[in-house]
């Protein structure tokens, strides 16, 4: 049993097979970069650049098909396999009569299946890009104006979007299992070769090539590097399957013996978060508040401003990373919960409404951030206009009172004016002329003097 899994005599060289696969990928990428540079050259017409930008995936598919025709279809070996002195053959032939002939080449059926795998990869990427172009709110089928075909299409897209991630995880797990099996047995480096039962053998057996002679080359460094690469790929495969927040919550609840905290916002927190300005992300503020042990006075609002705003179901704005992480956590934890359970969805910190999706804030970001400032400026302008109107009314009232006083006491007004005129005349004749003041009673003794008339006048001699 151990000898069958790990043969000791002339074991299959795993490093050559992996190097051949890496070389094929590098050659394909290098040719595609050169093709892209040719289409985007300034010496060529601009419509060629538009063709490349609109049909980049199709051009890459044509390049891969051309490489497949020149190498695998014609020579039963890719360019990387040829450099490593390897060739593909059909490992599923059990008839001894045709085994020697069939082991030197691939059958047409296997070539067609390999070609189909190339086309399948293209169509899978196209379907993924099309499905992920729809947001969750675009797939709602509650509208009354939708036709039957439109409802079926949206339901199909929604089903594919929910199952694509599961299929990707299953493919990653199968690839990991196949890779571990390849390290043990030395055959089938990927899933395609295992499904089609395609094996590799030396291309030239009559001469000893440097790359295919295991007796003259020490693979100690390659084997050590292969182990580290395997551990790295294992970590890359296993980390996306682990839900760190869910594992942390379950661990804390099991240690402390307490039930998970409700997703609803308390009344005290709701008062704090609802009073925050619109330009502040409530989730960032909550994280800063928790990290500072509740020292709210030490938290600067400028450090918790909204970055890359996204709008939730209730219409409030949060940071893209903050709201997406919250929705993703509750989406994974609430899979098995009924819709009536309040912990199935994350609740908005500002209004305590459940949020099931988020989308890009399509409005002007500055409008949302300046709305409160504009309202405050408008209130200040209204208050200042009211004060100005009040001052105008006070000044008009004082003017009316002054005019009434002068109208009633006309004699006093005339007397004051007469005295002012006398002072002006006195100042005018101070250049040496004699100024004499006559008493009205001495000059006009025979005339009756009115008591209300002025008692003196000024005359110049």
Curated annotation (Swiss-Prot):
SMART domains: RING. InterPro entries: PEX2/10 (IPR025654), Pex_N (IPR006845), Znf_RING (IPR001841), Znf_RING/FYVE/PHD (IPR013083), Znf_RING_CS (IPR017907). GO terms for biological process: peroxisome organization; protein import into peroxisome matrix, receptor recycling; protein ubiquitination. Coiled coil: none annotated. One of its GO terms (molecular function) is transferase activity. Keywords: Membrane, Metal-binding, Peroxisome, Peroxisome biogenesis, Protein transport, Transferase, Transmembrane, Transmembrane helix, Transport, Ubl conjugation pathway, Zinc, Zinc-finger. The keyword Hydrolase does not apply. Gene3D superfamilies: Zinc/RING finger domain, C3HC4 (zinc finger). Residues 388-397 have a biased composition (Basic and acidic residues). It comes from the Eukaryota. GO terms for cellular component: peroxisomal membrane. This is Peroxisomal biogenesis factor 2. E3 ubiquitin-protein ligase component of the peroxisomal translocation complex. The two types of peroxisomal matrix targeting signals, PTS1 and PTS2, are first recognized in the cytosol by their receptors PEX5 and PEX7, respectively, which then carry the cargo to the peroxisomal membrane. The peroxisomal targeting signal (PTS) receptor-cargo complexes interact with peroxisomal membrane protein (PMP) components of the docking complex. The three subunits of the retrotranslocation channel (PEX2, PEX10 and PEX12) coassemble in the membrane into a channel with an open 10 Angstrom pore. The RING-type zinc-fingers that catalyze PEX5 or PEX20 receptor ubiquitination are positioned above the pore on the cytosolic side of the complex. It catalyses: [E2 ubiquitin-conjugating enzyme]-S-ubiquitinyl-L-cysteine + [acceptor protein]-L-cysteine = [E2 ubiquitin-conjugating enzyme]-L-cysteine + [acceptor protein]-S-ubiquitinyl-L-cysteine. It comes from Komagataella pastoris. Pathway: Protein modification; protein ubiquitination. Its EC number is 2.3.2.36. Zn(2+) 2 binds at residues 314, 316, 348, 351.
């Amino acid at each position: 049993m151990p000898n069958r899994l790990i043969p000791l005599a002339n074991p299959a060289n795993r490093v050559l097979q992996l190097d051949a696969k890496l070389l094929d990928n590098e050659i394909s990428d290098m040719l595609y970069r050169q093709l892209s540079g040719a289409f985007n050259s300034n010496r060529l017409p601009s419509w060629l650049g538009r063709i490349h930008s609109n049909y980049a995936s199709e051009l890459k598919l044509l390049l891969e098909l051309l490489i497949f025709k020149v190498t695998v279809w014609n020579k039963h070996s890719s360019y990387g396999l040829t450099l490593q002195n390897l060739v593909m053959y059909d490992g599923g032939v059990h008839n001894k009569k045709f085994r020697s002939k069939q082991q030197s080449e691939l059958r047409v059926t296997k070539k067609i299946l390999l070609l189909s795998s190339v086309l399948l990869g293209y169509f899978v990427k196209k379907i993924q890009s099309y499905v992920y172009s729809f947001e969750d709110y675009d797939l709602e089928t509650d509208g009354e104006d939708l036709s039957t075909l439109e409802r079926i299409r949206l339901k199909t897209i929604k089903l594919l979007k929910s199952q694509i991630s599961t299929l990707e995880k299953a493919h990653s797990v199968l690839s990991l299992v196949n890779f571990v099996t390849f390290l043990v047995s030395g055959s089938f480096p990927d899933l395609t070769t295992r499904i089609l039962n395609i094996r590799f053998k030396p291309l030239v057996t009559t001469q000893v090539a440097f790359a295919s002679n295991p007796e003259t080359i020490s693979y100690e460094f390659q084997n050590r590097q292969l182990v580290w690469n395997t551990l790295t790929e294992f970590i890359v495969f296993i980390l996306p399957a682990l839900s760190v927040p869910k594992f942390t919550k379950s661990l804390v609840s099991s240690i402390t013996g307490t039930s998970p905290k409700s997703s609803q916002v308390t009344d005290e927190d709701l008062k704090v978060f609802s009073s925050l300005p619109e330009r502040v992300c409530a989730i960032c503020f909550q994280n800063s508040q928790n990290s500072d042990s509740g020292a709210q006075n030490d938290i600067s609002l400028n450090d918790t401003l909204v970055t890359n705003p996204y709008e939730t179901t209730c219409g409030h704005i949060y940071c893209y990373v903050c709201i997406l992480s919250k929705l993703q956590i509750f989406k994974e934890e609430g899979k098995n919960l009924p819709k009536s359970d309040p912990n199935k969805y994350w609740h908005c910190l500002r209004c305590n409404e459940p949020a099931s999706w988020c989308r890009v804030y399509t409005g002007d970001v500055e409008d949302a951030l300046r709305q409160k400032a504009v309202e405050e400026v408008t209130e200040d302008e209204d208050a200042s206009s009211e004060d100005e109107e009040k001052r105008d009314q006070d000044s008009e009232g004082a003017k009316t009172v002054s005019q009434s006083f002068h109208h009633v006491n006309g004699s006093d007004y005339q007397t004051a004016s007469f005295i002012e005129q006398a002072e002006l005349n006195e100042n005018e004749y101070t250049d040496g002329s004699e100024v004499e003041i006559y008493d009205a009673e001495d000059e006009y003794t025979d005339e009756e003097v009115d008591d209300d008339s002025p008692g003196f006048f000024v005359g110049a001699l």
